[in-house]
C-alpha cells in the first residue's frame, strides 16, 4: 500500500477549507517569542494528524520539560500520530538538546530534521530530494531509521557556461508545460541551447512525485509531507488510511 502523504496546513488554510485532507499536518506551532513555552498549539485536529513544531522563533532559553509537557498534553488530546521537528538552525545547540529530550519523553514517533538527527534515537525528516539527484543516494545513510520525506514540486534550472554550472530553484508555478520524462529521477526536463550556454530546466509534476513516493516506499520511507498550498489534495494513489 502506498505510503501516506501528510499535507501541511496553516491555521488560516484550515479555517478556509471546506473539506480537510484525509491526512494532514498542523504547521503553525512554534516557540513563544514572549515567554517560555509554545505558541499556536492546535485546539482541534482530525484524528490521525501529525503535528509540526518549527524553530522560526529561536529556542533561546525555553525549558525542554515544559515544551514536552505542552506537546504531550496536545498529542494525547488530539490523538496525533507523530511529531515532526522541522528545525532549520543547525548551529543552535539548544535545538538539539530539546530534540533529544522530546525523542526520549514523548509517547509517539518524533521525526527530526536530517540536520539534527545524527546520533539521536528517533525518526529522520529528509529534506526534499532535488530533481537532479537520485533518491537512493540521499537515503542510504539513514537506512534502519524511520524516515519521513519532505516532498515538493519545486524545480531546478541549471545553466552551463564555459565558467561552470549555476543552479537556481524553480518555483512550482514557473515550471514549463510538456518536456521529456526521466523515470529514474522522477522528473520532467527541457534543454535549451545557444552559442554560449546550455540551460537544463527540471521539474516535478504531481505524477512525478507519486512515482517518487513509490520508490521511497521500496527504499523504506514511512511517510511523506507536502505543503497543502502546493499539492492541494493527496497525490494519485496516495494512501487514505
Residue spans of the language-model regions?
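Acidic/aromatic/glycine-rich contiguous surface patches that form carbohydrate-binding/processing clefts
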Residues: 220-241
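Extracytoplasmic/secreted cell-surface and envelope-processing proteins
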Residues: 35-37, 60-62, 91-96, 134, ...
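A structural motif corresponding to the C-terminal end of an alpha-helix
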Residues: 77-80, 102-107, 138-145, 211-223
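Acidic, serine/threonine- and glycine-rich low-complexity intrinsically disordered segments
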Residues: 118, 124-143
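Soluble or luminal CAZymes and related metallo-dependent hydrolases
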Residues: 66-67, 94, 130-134, 201-208
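Glycan-binding loop/region signatures in secreted carbohydrate-active enzymes
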Residues: 144-211
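An acidic- and aromatic-residue-enriched active-site/binding cleft used to recognize and process polar
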Residues: 115, 154, 229
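Chitinase-like catalytic core of GlcNAc-active glycosidases
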Residues: 1-128, 148-149
Amino acid at each position: 500500500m502506498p505510503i501516506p502523504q501528510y499535507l501541511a496546513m496553516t491555521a488560516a488554510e484550515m479555517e478556509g477549507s471546506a473539506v480537510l485532507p484525509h491526512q494532514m499536518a498542523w504547521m503553525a506551532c512554534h516557540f513563544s517569542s514572549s515567554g517560555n513555552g509554545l505558541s499556536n498549539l492546535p485546539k482541534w485536529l482530525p484524528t490521525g494528524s501529525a503535528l509540526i513544531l518549527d524553530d522560526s522563533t529561536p529556542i533561546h532559553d525555553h525549558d525542554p520539560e515544559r515544551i514536552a509537557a505542552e506537546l504531550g498534553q496536545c498529542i494525547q488530546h488530539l490523538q496525533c500520530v507523530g511529531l515532526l521537528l522541522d528545525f532549520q538552525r543547525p548551529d543552535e545547540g539548544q535545538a538539539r538538546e530539546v530534540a533529544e529530550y522530546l525523542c526520549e519523553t514523548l509517547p509517539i514517533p518524533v521525526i527530526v530534521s536530517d540536520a539534527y538527527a545524527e546520533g539521536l534515537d528517533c525518526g529522520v525528516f529528509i529534506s526534499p530530494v532535488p530533481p537532479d539527484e537520485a533518491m537512493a543516494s540521499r537515503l542510504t545513510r539513514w537506512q534502519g531509521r524511520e524516515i519521513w520525506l519532505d516532498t515538493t514540486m519545486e524545480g531546478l534550472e541549471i545553466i552551463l557556461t564555459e565558467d561552470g554550472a549555476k543552479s537556481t530553484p524553480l518555483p512550482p508555478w514557473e515550471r514549463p508545460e510538456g518536456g521529456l520524462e526521466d523515470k529514474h529521477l522522477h522528473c520532467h526536463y527541457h534543454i535549451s541551447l545557444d552559442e554560449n550556454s546550455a540551460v537544463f530546466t527540471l521539474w516535478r509534476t504531481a505524477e512525478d512525485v507519486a512515482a517518487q513516493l513509490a520508490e521511497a516506499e521500496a527504499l523504506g520511507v514511512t511517510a511523506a509531507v507536502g505543503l497543502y498550498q502546493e499539492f492541494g489534495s493527496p497525490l494519485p494513489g496516495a494512501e487514505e488510511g
